[in-house]
Amino acid sequence: MSKYQKKSDGELKRTLTKLQYDVTQNAHTEPPYTNEYNRHYEKGIYVDITSGEPLFISTDKFKSGCGWPAFTKPISQDLIANYRDESHGMIRTEVRAKNSNSHLGHVFRDGPEEHGGLRYCINSAALKFIPFAEMESAGYGEYLKLFKESN
């Protein structure tokens, strides 16, 4: 069992904002461009807002112009589940956190070719950012090595 456990629905309703709950639990999409992490490039780690599980690191984030945070890859493919999404008259690939089953966003094949060609377009409301300087004290010290590997 993972050390990162999703909270109960009641606890999620008490601790998340309405937008965070709607995005993660009801697969809604937050408005583009005005969300918290769209233009956020501080060094650190992005974790699942519902479970705390690490999902993305800042060194894999890039300016895509799509209006939401965009990453070239998750920390590990084992953390992500992909599903076919035919909503809104489109065919897309939905991205969910595998452990908590929280909706994160979508993945597209128009990312930087030199980094694999994928663009993980993720709702800020599904994420919590842990600054690099606070990772150890927040319990994410084991992920500090990812920053050394990516330099």
Curated annotation (Swiss-Prot):
Location of the MsrB domain: 9-132
Annotated keywords: Oxidoreductase
InterPro entries hit by this protein: Met_Sox_Rdtase_MsrB (IPR028427), Met_Sox_Rdtase_MsrB_dom (IPR002579), Mss4-like_sf (IPR011057)
EC number: 1.8.4.12
Pfam families membership: SelR
Disulfide partners: none
GO annotations of cellular component type: cytoplasm
GO molecular function, one term: peptide-methionine (R)-S-oxide reductase activity
Catalytic activity of the protein: L-methionyl-[protein] + [thioredoxin]-disulfide + H2O = L-methionyl-(R)-S-oxide-[protein] + [thioredoxin]-dithiol
Active site: 121 (nucleophile)
One GO BP: response to oxidative stress
Family of this protein: Belongs to the MsrB Met sulfoxide reductase family.
NCBIfam families the record matches: peptide-methionine (R)-S-oxide reductase MsrB
Name of the protein in its database record: Peptide methionine sulfoxide reductase MsrB
